[in-house]
A protein has these predicted regions:
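Peripheral, non-catalytic segments flanking oxidoreductase cores
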Residues: 1-332
Length: 332
C-alpha cells in the first residue's frame, strides 16, 4: 500500500480510529491515531477510516435504500424533485446534469437524493438555506427508507463528532487551540446525506464525469461506497497525478472540505477529487457532509484574522456549480 511519504503514492492512507471508541485504550494508542489523521489531512486531505464501529448491516442497508430509490420510475422520483422542497431547504431528487463543477466540462451524469436533519415545516427557520423538512417518496414505506436512513444519519453525526476531536488534537501546539475548538460546528449543523447513482456510460466522453473535478464545500465528508465498484480519484499535488480510491471493505473514505481548510489556514487540506464514469457498471454511494452550523463564524485558527461564516460560504459554492435557471428555481 502506498503512503504519503512515497514519491508517487499509490493509495490514500488508512486511519484506525478504534482507540478513541475504547475507554480502556492507552494514551499511546490514541496519540498514534492523532498522528496518523494529522499526517493524512495535512498532506492528502483524504484517508480510509476503519475501526469506526458502524455495523456492516447498517452500511449495507443504506446502499439498499439507495438502490430502492433509484429503481423508482422517473415520475416517482420527480415527485420529490429538489425544486419542490420548502423554500431554500435544498432537499429531494437531483436529476442528472444538474451540476457543472468546472468550466469546460459537461454536466455531471450522477443522479442524487439529498436529505438532512429534519426540521418541522412550522419551525421559524424552516425553508431557510439548507434547513427544512425532508421530502420522502410516498412509494417507499418508511420502514424501508426514511427510518433506516435517519437512523444512519444520526450515527454519522456522532461519528464526525469523534473525528473532529481527533482533528483538534492534531493542530499545531503553538496555535494553543482548545480541545473543543471544532465542537460548535456539530451543534444544529447543516449535515446533508446524499444518495448517489451513477448509471453506466457506454459512450465515454473526455469532458464528462460522474462528478467533475471539485473540492467539497464543508468541513468533513464521509463517503460510503459499494464494494465492487470503482471510479473515485483524488488529485495529489506534489506529483500532479490522480490517485484511485478503490473500495476498501468495512471502511469509509474521509476527506476535508474547503471550510476546514479555511478554518485551519490550509493546515488541513481540501483535496480535489472526481468520479470517473464506468462504461458498463452502475455505481451507488452515500456521502455524508458535515458542513457545520450555518451561522457559525469561523476565525482562522492561525491568528491571521480571516473570518468565514459557514452558511455564506456553502451557499456561494453551490451558486458556482448550480447556476442559471436551475439555481434560481432552487433559491440560490
Amino acid at each position: 500500500m502506498g503512503s504519503m511519504g512515497e514519491t508517487h503514492p499509490t493509495s490514500i492512507p488508512t486511519v484506525d480510529i478504534s482507540p478513541f471508541l475504547d475507554v480502556q485504550a492507552s494514551k499511546e494508542a490514541k496519540e498514534s491515531v492523532v498522528t496518523a489523521m494529522r499526517d493524512a489531512c495535512s498532506s492528502f486531505g483524504f484517508f480510509y477510516l476503519v475501526g469506526h464501529g458502524i455495523p456492516e448491516e447498517d452500511r449495507q442497508e443504506i446502499l439498499n435504500c439507495t438502490k430502492r430509490y433509484f429503481d423508482l420510475p422517473m415520475e416517482k422520483k420527480m415527485e420529490t424533485w429538489i425544486g419542490k422542497a420548502m423554500g431554500r431547504s435544498f432537499r429531494g431528487y437531483e436529476p442528472p446534469a444538474l451540476q457543472v463543477h468546472q468550466e469546460g466540462l459537461l454536466p455531471d451524469t450522477k443522479e442524487g437524493f439529498i436529505l438532512g436533519r429534519e426540521t418541522p415545516a412550522d419551525a421559524p427557520e424552516a425553508g431557510t438555506f439548507h434547513t427544512g423538512p425532508n421530502q420522502w417518496p410516498k412509494s417507499l414505506p418508511d420502514e424501508e427508507f426514511s427510518i433506516p436512513i435517519m437512523r444512519y444519519h444520526a450515527k454519522m453525526i456522532e461519528m464526525v463528532k469523534v473525528i473532529v476531536k481527533v482533528l483538534a488534537l492534531g493542530l499545531p501546539a503553538e496555535w494553543k487551540c482548545p480541545l473543543d475548538v471544532f465542537d460548535e460546528l456539530t451543534v444544529n449543523p447543516s449535515a446533508p446525506l446524499r444518495l448517489l447513482y451513477y448509471a453506466p456510460q457506454p459512450v465515454k466522453k473526455e469532458n464528462q464525469f460522474g462528478v467533475g473535478d471539485h473540492t467539497d464545500f464543508g468541513n468533513v465528508s464521509v463517503l460510503l461506497q459499494e464494494e465492487g465498484t470503482e471510479g473515485l480519484e483524488v488529485f495529489y499535488p506534489p506529483t500532479q497525478t490522480w490517485v484511485p480510491v478503490p473500495v476498501k471493505p468495512h471502511s469509509y473514505v474521509i476527506n476535508m472540505g474547503d471550510m476546514m481548510q479555511k478554518w485551519t489556514a490550509g493546515y488541513y487540506k481540501s483535496a480535489r477529487h472526481r468520479v470517473v464514469n464506468n462504461n458498463t457498471k452502475s455505481r451507488y454511494s452515500a456521502p455524508f457532509f458535515m458542513n457545520g452550523n450555518l451561522d457559525l463564524k469561523c476565525h482562522s485558527l492561525d491568528g491571521s484574522g480571516e473570518v468565514t461564516v459557514i452558511g455564506e460560504h456553502i451557499r456561494q459554492r453551490l451558486m458556482e456549480t448550480i447556476g442559471g435557471e436551475a439555481g434560481k428555481k432552487l433559491g440560490l
